[in-house]
Amino acid sequence: MAADVHKKKGWEVPNGSLAPGDGQHAERSESPTPGLAQGTEPGAGQEGAMFVHTRSYEDLTSPEDGGAVVRSPEERRGEPAEPTSMEQISKDFSELSTQLTGMALDLEEEMRQSQEGKLEPSPQATRHDSVLSGKEEEDVTMDTWRMHRKHVFVLSEAGKPVYSRYGSEEALSSTMGVMMALVSFLEAEKNAIRSIHADGYKVVFVRRSPLVLVAVARTRQSEQEIAHELLYIYYQILSLLTWTQLNHIFQQKQNYDLRRLLAGSERITDNLLDLMAHDPSFLMGAVRCLPLAASVRDAVSTSLQQAKAKSLVFSILLSGNQLVSLVRKKDQFLHPIDLHLLFNLISSSSSFREGEAWTPICLPKFNSSGFFHAHISYLEQEMDLCLLLVSTDREDFFTVSDCKRRFQERLRRRGVHHALQEALRTPFYSVAQVGIPDLRHFIYKSKSSGLFTSPEIEAPYVREEEKERLLGLYQYLHSRAHNSSCPLKNIYFTGPRENLLAWVTSAFELYICYSPLGTKAGAISAVNKLMKWIRKEEDRLFILTPQTY
């Protein structure tokens, strides 16, 4: 069973990244210089880390999920029990499919009918019949379909369509068949296809048996970054099915139509692709915090910590796609990818605002073999605060629901409701607060904490296409800085509409955008001022004292 669950001492994750080290208790440097050690940079947690350390693309391409990882019983504490059969997973999936489609799908019954050849064409297996899709199909023969800057396709190794970003899977089935034939042909020659570059397009292939994911893009993104996004789609599918169930399905029938089980989930995958096109969290492989006074955040975290139950593994409070607080079980570390998938699930549906939801969810980077159960609810209708309580016990709804009640009581007792409401009125800060005239925007990531901060995108990047263009420039700098063959630590980019600078060290990553009239010397001076400002504001912009049960 693959999992990124680790002890705090004496371990190394399979991809070779470093564990949350005890060195994070070291003295924190007051000088923002390149000599900052990891764990002492602005934004680094002073009392341990919340997340498994990641190395962005390299982490995503670590050994495939499902491989055995030998760990002691102590290391396994807090995880869902290893399923002894498919029955429990099937039962959990039936609950999840009911929430997604309004229809309960029995996996074992599906597989029995499939083997007996009794499956009727499912009206839920096509996107245009899914009432949850919320958008019309595009004609794949029209120029408007071809003009999209990025297409994403998911297919099985048998060439069966699973998902397409635009257009119906039926209309694209022959195209996907050609893609699979190309992959298979090269594999027969004992080779593997990773990408094709032609006429300004990149065609990127990612194979995660039993699935093949393909993107056709004409963006500034590198091959690695496009593969990064495809792997997010793969993990999104695992979060709905589990790795165990996905492999069980195709072991039983190689040409199974997976759309039957994923019907109704297209909007979740669509939403994930939309988020990746606009939110730098995915590019940075990190989580952004809601700017909040340290005293208020500490009161929230303490309230979460005290409203605990035996089965709880993670208690998460979020606003939009920003983290307010996270409390974890001791020695259990959440992965940023799993948190991104939770954010995406919540932002994909407004139904979570209507009451308390109790839904199975797989956290594929934590444990890809089984389901947790997540209690999802908003604290109040008028407040954009969503509470996720992740439990290992599928029968523990009422106990976990009581945790929410106790959490709200403690918030009221501590008198932090008003402060939270004020923070939610301005969920982003202005770059003008930094006090650097030519500075337009920046992204700063603390590597040891797995957190990043950036201001609101303001003029001249007002229109949506301008915001996407700015993110595209950051993607270009990021791809150059993390190029697998020739990574760069410092990049200075000059353009007709803005200048940019990237600075990547072992402790942090910084990307800044400023006026095209600025000079290189001015940019370097701005970096020094900006780092001092981040250090001064770090207790408001980051979670420096993460709590555990």
UniProtKB/Swiss-Prot annotation:
GO terms for cellular component: Mon1-Ccz1 complex. Residues 110-119 have a biased composition (Basic and acidic residues). Residues 1-90, 109-137 are annotated as: Disordered. InterPro entries: FUZ/MON1/HPS1_longin_1, FUZ/MON1/HPS1_longin_2, FUZ/MON1/HPS1_longin_3, Mon1. GO terms for molecular function: guanyl-nucleotide exchange factor activity. One of its GO terms (biological process) is vesicle-mediated transport. Belongs to the MON1/SAND family. Plays an important role in membrane trafficking through the secretory apparatus. Not involved in endocytic trafficking to lysosomes. This is Vacuolar fusion protein MON1 homolog A. It comes from Gallus gallus. The gene is MON1A.
